Amino acid sequence: PAYMPKDMIFEMETSYKYIFKGEKDYLPFMEIRELHSSIKFQNINIETFKHNHGSIDVQTYRIGNFAYSTDLKKFYDNDIDKLRNLDLWIVGLLRDDEHPSHAGYDKIIEYINYIKPKKTIFTHMTALLDEKLLKSKCPKNVFPGYDGQIIEI
């Protein structure tokens, strides 16, 4: 299944009809399910909330003491408080400076200092980030991620 907020369902069904409804020689191969603020997948409880990604909203996911936020520009209201008491936060850092739809390094570090996760790993990084420089300025519990990385939660 593909989980998504209610406001995205029509757009996805229209833009990608062949995936969800089938079309011509395509059989449907995915089912849309509405994403609520809390979903249960098998035995796993997943909390979700929207955050801003420039001109659109995307989701942060929290599973126990782990959370994942990519394409993050800013949080709404007090939603950042939902990220307290994390063991691990994986968060997107597109580049060092601000971008119209992504927070820059300084803003992400501000978020980290506020929520105080035990460990943070950056993802969704571009080649514009110098890995050595990034590693040298990251706090001791903050690390750039890498392709193929295996993370135990």
Regions from the language model: what does each represent?
Residues 1-69, 135-153:
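Binuclear metal-dependent hydrolase catalytic cores
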Residues 52-59, 63-92:
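Active-site-proximal loop/helix segments of hydrolase catalytic cores
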Residues 76-88, 93-153:
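Binuclear metal-ion centers of metallo-dependent hydrolases, dominated by the metallo-beta-lactamase
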Residues 7, 53, 73, 95, ...:
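Short, glycine/serine-rich, charged loops/turns that create anion-binding
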